[in-house]
Amino acid sequence: MNPHDNPLKAVGPHYDAAQMLIAREHTRAAVEAIAAAMQPGMAESEAIETAKDILADMGLLRGWHDVYVRFGSNTVQIGGAPADPHRVLGEDDIFLVDIGPCWQHWEGDGGDTFVTGSNREMARCAEDVKAIFHEVRRHWLSTGATGRQLYEFAKASTERRGWELNFDLPGHRISDFPHKAIVNVPLSGIEFRPSQELWVLEIHIRDKDRRFGAFFEDMLLDDSYFER
């Protein structure tokens, strides 16, 4: 059942790397579909219901964590943290999407940040979070860094750009459902090189005055999966 000696690399009976990648493709498509449905004037509570409808239409409503959509100042909060559900998306605003759908036996996990207008700082934040993600991911590829070392690197990369890294989103395992029954430790806490397809790198950055933030997450994978 567990092909690895290290219990933190354990998988369940339905684990299949190829199917995990298909779950990832469905998840990334769902994030984009949800983002496309967000309109200025929409309340955050309405946005979450819209996101759930989209996931249901895609056969992805069952998830291993709740559906999160955050607008404006609520983007400084992690999923599950208290936030104003009546926050309305503005014409010149920032928002993030964070979903963890299950496709059949396999878990997906994806998040991204988008802007609705031309606010340069918000746009830079949304762009920088992706740049930091890929900088950390390439560091993982080139150095064999441990999970803990990746988040030390992420902190430096974030601060160099003038943002604050939120360590309350420290990365995690992913597997056949439910991974939390198999392994439930943060990526930032492991002292070995995380394996491709088994770990999700989460990057959540915030404006130092906590006015807004940005989020991006995806599987740890090599460059070929991001060149399409």
Where are these regions (language model features)?
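Active-site neighborhoods and metal-handling regions in enzymes and metal-associated proteins
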Residues: M1-R228
